[in-house]
Amino acid sequence: MAATTAALSGATMSTAFAPKTPPMTAALPTNVGRALFGLKSSASRGRVTAMAAYKVTLVTPEGKQELECPDDVYILDAAEEAGIDLPYSCRAGSCSSCAGKVTSGSVNQDDGSFLDDDQIKEGWVLTCVAYPTGDVTIETHKEEELTA
């Protein structure tokens, strides 16, 4: 292999040992802190808070299915990520396609607009806008029962 010489602004440099292609660098995922350490960062001055994950039990027509769901992930999204098929349509809490009934535990579904306060007190939940606030059990596929 013959070495080549390049002149750059009057300086001479040998390229015999220079790699022909630039080295590849692996980019770290942006959520590496959360994934490895159970932490999430806040946009305000680098504060870090602990992230909780709860056990969500879904009672589906196929039977009970359990998954871990972080407190900042919608239950529908966590279920899909775990390979559990749940009904949905709008993904915004403005319809009843993903309706379920909480039989134990609690959720935060402040992002939704379809359910009224009485329905929420009765245990109705829209999984597309519900975050777990503790371990929770939800009966899914309840749209027909809700709208009856």
UniProtKB/Swiss-Prot annotation:
- Family matches, as Gene3D superfamilies: 3.10.20.30
Record's keyword terms, sorted: 2Fe-2S, Chloroplast, Electron transport, Iron, Iron-sulfur, Metal-binding, Plastid, Transit peptide, Transport
Its primary localisation, in coarse terms, equals plastid
Q: Do you know which InterPro entries this protein is assigned to?
A: 2Fe-2S_ferredoxin-like_sf (IPR036010), 2Fe-2S_ferredoxin-type (IPR001041), 2Fe2S_fd_BS (IPR006058), Beta-grasp_dom_sf (IPR012675), Fd_pln (IPR010241)
Q: Name one GO biological process term.
A: electron transport chain
What does the entry's cofactor note say about binding and number? Answer: Binds 1 [2Fe-2S] cluster.
Binding of [2Fe-2S] cluster, residues: 90, 95, 98, 128
Compartment(s):
Plastid, Chloroplast
Occurrences of domain 2Fe-2S ferredoxin-type (ranges) = 54-144
Gene Ontology terms: cellular component: chloroplast stroma
Which cofactors go with this protein? [2Fe-2S] cluster
Q: What are the boundaries of the transit peptide? A: 1-51
PROSITE patterns linked to this entry: 2FE2S_FER_1, 2FE2S_FER_2
Superkingdom of the organism of origin: Eukaryota
Q: What's one GO MF term for it? A: electron transfer activity
> What role is this protein assigned?
Ferredoxins are iron-sulfur proteins that transfer electrons in a wide variety of metabolic reactions.
Family, according to the entry, reads as follows: Belongs to the 2Fe2S plant-type ferredoxin family.
The name this protein carries in UniProt is: Ferredoxin-1, chloroplastic
What is the scientific name of the source organism?
Mesembryanthemum crystallinum (Common ice plant)
